[in-house]
C-alpha cells in the first residue's frame, strides 16, 4: 500500500508550554491523502483541515470526503462532519452523521463507521439505514464493500420498493 499526504501548513506554531500529547504536530489546510494497492489508487481522502498527531500515529480531519475507486473508476464516496485517519494502517473512522453513496445511487447513512483498507470493507456497530434502488434496509451493525454491493446488516428490517420485482 502507498500513502501520500498533501496540504498547506498553518503558520501558527504550537505553544511551547502546551501538553504535546494533545497538541497537533502539524496542522494542514486542504488536506489530501491518496492510498494505493498494487499500484492502483483505492481511495482519496480530502478534508478542509487535518491535525496530525505523530506520536499517536493519527490525524483528525474536518469534513472528510473519502472517494473509493475500483478498476480505476470512482465506485462510491463517503461524506462526514468529522473523521480520524490512522497514519500507519490508513484506517479511516468517521462520525457525526456519515453518508456513503455508490455509483448506482445506493445510499448508506449512519452515525459512525470505519473503513479498513486491508480488507477493503466498511464496518459500523451503530444503527444503519441503506437505500438501494429496489429496497430499504434498517438495522444495527454493518459490514460492506465500499460499492455497497455485498452488505451484511444485523437486526435488519427490509422493505421492497413499490413497483419493483424480485
Describe the role of every protein-language-model region.
Residues 1-166:
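Mature-chain termini and adjacent capping regions
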Amino acid at each position: 500500500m502507498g500513502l501520500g499526504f498533501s496540504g498547506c501548513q498553518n503558520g501558527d506554531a504550537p505553544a511551547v508550554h502546551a501538553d504535546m500529547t494533545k497538541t497537533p504536530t502539524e496542522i494542514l489546510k486542504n488536506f489530501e491523502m491518496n492510498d494505493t494497492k498494487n499500484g492502483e489508487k483505492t481511495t482519496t481522502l480530502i478534508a478542509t483541515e487535518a491535525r496530525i498527531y505523530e506520536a499517536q500515529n493519527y490525524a483528525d480531519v474536518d469534513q472528510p470526503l473519502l472517494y473509493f475507486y475500483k478498476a480505476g473508476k470512482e465506485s462510491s464516496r463517503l461524506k462526514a462532519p468529522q473523521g480520524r485517519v490512522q497514519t500507519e494502517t490508513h484506517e479511516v473512522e468517521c462520525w457525526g452523521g456519515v453518508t456513503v453513496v455508490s455509483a448506482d445511487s445506493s445510499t448508506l447513512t449512519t452515525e459512525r463507521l470505519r473503513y479498513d483498507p486491508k480488507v477493503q470493507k466498511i464496518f459500523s456497530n451503530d444503527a444503519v439505514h441503506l437505500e438501494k434502488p429496489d429496497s430499504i434496509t434498517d438495522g444495527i451493525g454493518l459490514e460492506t464493500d465500499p460499492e455497497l454491493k455485498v452488505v451484511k446488516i444485523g437486526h435488519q428490517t427490509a422493505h421492497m420498493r413499490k413497483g419493483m420485482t424480485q
